[in-house]
A protein has these predicted regions:
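Short loop/beta submotifs within extracellular cysteine-rich repeat domains
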Residues: 6, 49, 55-58, 73-75, ...
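Sec-dependent signal peptide recognition
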Residues: 2-8
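Bacterial signal peptide processing site
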Residues: 17-21
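The feature marks the first
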Residues: 27, 33-40, 44-83
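Sequence/structural segment immediately N-terminal to covalent heme-attachment motifs in c-type
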Residues: 31-54, 129-154
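Axial heme c-ligation environment in periplasmic c-type cytochrome domains
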Residues: 58-65, 81-110, 127, 131, ...
């Protein structure tokens, strides 16, 4: 019976992790039988198909790398997906799929899964996929981003600012666009997201965003 539940969860993740451009994506709900299972079981059954066995991410499936984020940030985002803080906007198809794919996670599940991701899986460094002027990007980053995300882009949990170094560059771009477009940071309980949404327009155009991301890609991640 457990094997059947695992296979169903794997199938669900394969369907749910598509990109935002899918016309009418099927949206499965996480199998309730996985709630309360060991972190590795949840990870391998529900997450690996999209995020990769090492948490390295998969651009084709819209799944970012995860292992350079802090356990605190991962826990908060998973909690937001479960509670409806994230994935609630009608135009956020990817967020909606993610929210439903983890719908049955409990607070304990989230805590052990976040710990597993950040301690048991190897730190990965995604492949660079975007082009930009890292020198220009450094100026923008130092003036606009470093106060919260740190001069080394390794984040600051006290400020709710995630690590950026070591995160998939295409996902950084997608997330930034989400804040600009109002897909993220609009829920009344998303305090940190609201801060980011207010600050996002500070970068004038997409070239500037790419330059900042190009600079971030030159920085060493939190975990080697």
């Amino acid at each position: 019976m457990q094997r059947v539940a695992t296979l169903l969860a794997l199938l669900g993740c394969l369907i749910s992790c598509g990109d935002n451009n899918s016309a009418e994506p099927a949206i499965p709900v996480m199998s309730g039988s996985l709630a309360g299972a060991p972190a590795e079981t949840i990870w391998r059954s529900q997450c690996v198909a999209c995020h990769g066995s090492s948490g390295e991410g998969n651009r084709a499936l819209g799944a970012p790398a995860l292992t350079q984020l802090s356990a605190e940030y991962i826990s908060r985002q998973l909690t937001h997906f479960v509670s409806g803080v994230r994935g609630a906007h009608p135009d956020d198809a990817a967020g909606k799929r993610m929210a439903l794919s983890v719908a049955h996670l409990t607070a304990d599940d989230i805590a052990v899964l976040a710990r597993y991701l950040t301690t048991e899986l190897p730190g990965t460094r995604p492949t660079v996929t975007l082009k930009g002027n890292a020198t220009r990007g450094q100026d923008y980053y130092s003036n606009l981003c470093s106060a919260c995300h740190g001069g080394d882009a390794k984040g600051n949990d006290l400020l709710g600012a995630p690590a950026l170094a070591g995160v998939s560059d295409w996902y950084l771009l997608s997330s930034y666009q989400g804040f600009l477009d109002g897909l993220r940071g609009q829920h009344p309980d998303d305090n940190y997201g609201a801060q980011m949404a207010r600050l996002a327009p500070a970068l004038p155009d997409s070239n500037d965003v790419n330059d900042v991301i190009a600079y971030i890609a030159t920085l060493p991640p939190r975990r080697p």
